Amino acid sequence: TADVLCNINLEQLIHVHEVNQRNMSVVYKKMPKEQMSSVNSVLNLDETDTVSCVKDYDASHYAEDDLIAMSTGIYIINTDFLISLMEVEQYEESPRKLRYLLLDKLVDVAALGYEYAGYMKNIHDVKSYYDANMDMLDPQKFTSLLHATQKVYTKVKNEEATYFANSSEIFNSQFASGSVIEGRVENSIISRRCQLEKEACISDSII
């Protein structure tokens, strides 16, 4: 399976779900082909944004410039309806995990598709994990993810600020607190409490 990185306003999603009076709503994102994976599910939606088909992603079915409606695996479900689904499923010979149960029910229950238009990264392998981190060096993507309407606050460590020696050379990089930097860093993300000596050179890396 894949994970998604995004900052979604759940209150807005719940409002749309309630206004449309559906038992289930699912968030999707139109993704470029190069960011898709065979583990992703693709949604087809009709003119009312109702999910009409769910299928596994197959790269051979899409052109390079296509935008593909990828399911994010984020759902809003009425509580009573969810309980009834799970009560029925528990008596099956091989009960499905919840994420598969919900995915399989999208068409049957005429689920509403909710398009997410903000920053999102589909993380399904080491490269996509690396790319998601490198995206944070882009100010627009960084702001969209961490400083949207609902801001993200990381855990406070109350450490001293990172120290940059006179010998340090820094280009397009981000640093957490508590580090000592004496060498050269470019296009990289450096975590807390890292020590880079004078002769060290870090490039295009996550440390």
Describe the residue ranges of each PLM region.
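Unchanged
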Residues: 1-133
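Left-handed beta-helix
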Residues: 80, 89-207
